[in-house]
């Protein structure tokens, strides 16, 4: 049966009824964007700008850091992060080496995260300092290999300096973004910064390999870890771009990435579709009217 037999008259003009299945793993989405638009701003994080070339370099370093930690194809890497540049880098690095990214809500109760960790069996955790500080109080994190993300390390230098000021407003903002973690927990930011790039000849995963585990809400039963392959997520990306296709242009769009990366919608729309378009992502760790207004002054959104 041909694609013409699947035409949908209720679809918008120009939207195909059938899209081609992806033949390459998810990490190649970023590879392609970095080749086509290396100097395009990939990420705006509260004023910090990261180009696609820089993002690609960070991903290659993070991939090698994971490999040197012993992560191999099929191993699970637990991400307990809000939207931030480190989250984006970790995802593409994990996919690049064929490992599986298990997404967790960083604001979820410790008991829920503990059950999810047991469910997928991953032993490496990359987490936000505030999430790890709470988890360390509630569960035995020493059963895992744990690295902390300092979200303020991705801020512009002037904002980092402002957070160190001995004033109430700076202290409140610092406490909102950071928390002290035990000394045995490593620094993910420092590890990636000191790592060389992944060897270029490192084998890519197959499109049918599992790429991500997303956890269901458990509304109708026990929460489950849903296995999503590179094919699953690549197909979702292709379909999303097919619907948006007549209205977006490669290398010209600005997405406001406020939908959580750890949810299917945010992962597909922002982490994948935006990168496939070589769009600029204004990455927002949470929704805030003031954050959006400030972002609009820097980068008015198109999507």
Feature-to-residue mapping (PLM):
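Conserved adenylate-forming
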Residues: 66-72, 195-208, 213-257, 277-281
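Conserved AMP-binding/adenylate-forming core of the ANL superfamily
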Residues: 20-22, 31, 39-84, 88-92, ...
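Structural core segment of the AMP-binding/adenylate-forming
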Residues: 68-69, 96-190
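A short helix-loop-beta submotif of the ANL/AMP-binding
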Residues: 63, 76, 82-102, 106-110, ...
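Flexible, non-catalytic linker and terminal segments flanking ANL/adenylate-forming cores
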Residues: 1-23
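Conserved AMP-binding/adenylation subdomain of ANL enzymes
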Residues: 234-254, 262-303
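Conserved S/T- and glycine-rich ATP-binding loop of Class I adenylate-forming
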Residues: 77, 94, 125, 210, ...
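Alpha-helix-centered segments that form part of catalytic cores
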Residues: 23, 175-207
């Amino acid at each position: 049966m041909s694609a013409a037999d699947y035409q949908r008259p209720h679809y918008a003009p120009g939207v195909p009824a059938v899209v081609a299945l992806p033949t390459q793993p998810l990490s190649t989405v970023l590879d392609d964007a970095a080749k086509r638009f290396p100097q395009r701003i990939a990420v705006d994080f509260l004023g910090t700008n990261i180009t696609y070339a820089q993002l690609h370099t960070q991903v290659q370093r993070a991939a090698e850091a994971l490999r040197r930690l012993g992560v191999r194809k099929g191993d699970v890497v637990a991400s307990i992060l809000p939207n931030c540049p480190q989250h984006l880098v970790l995802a593409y690095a994990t996919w690049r080496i064929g490992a599986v990214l298990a997404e967790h809500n960083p604001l979820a109760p410790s008991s829920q995260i503990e059950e999810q960790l047991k469910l997928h069996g991953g032993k490496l955790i990359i987490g936000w300092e505030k999430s790890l500080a709470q988890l360390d109080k509630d569960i035995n994190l020493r059963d895992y290999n744990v690295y902390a993300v300092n979200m303020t390390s991705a801020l512009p230098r002037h904002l980092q300096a402002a957070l160190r000021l001995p004033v109430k407003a700076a202290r409140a903002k610092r406490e909102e973004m950071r928390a002290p973690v035990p000394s045995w927990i490593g620094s993910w930011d420092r590890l990636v910064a000191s790592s060389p790039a992944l060897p270029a000849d490192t084998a890519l995963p197959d499109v049918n390999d599992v790429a991500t585990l997303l956890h269901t809400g458990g509304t109708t039963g026990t929460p489950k870890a849903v296995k999503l392959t590179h094919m699953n997520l690549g197909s979702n990306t292709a379909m999303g771009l097919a619907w948006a296709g007549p209205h977006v242009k490669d290398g010209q769009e600005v997405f406001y990435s406020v939908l959580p990366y750890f949810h299917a919608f945010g992962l597909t729309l922002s982490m994948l579709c935006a990168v496939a378009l070589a769009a600029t992502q204004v990455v927002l760790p949470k929704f805030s009217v003031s954050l959006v207004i400030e972002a609009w002054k820097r980068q008015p959104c198109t999507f």
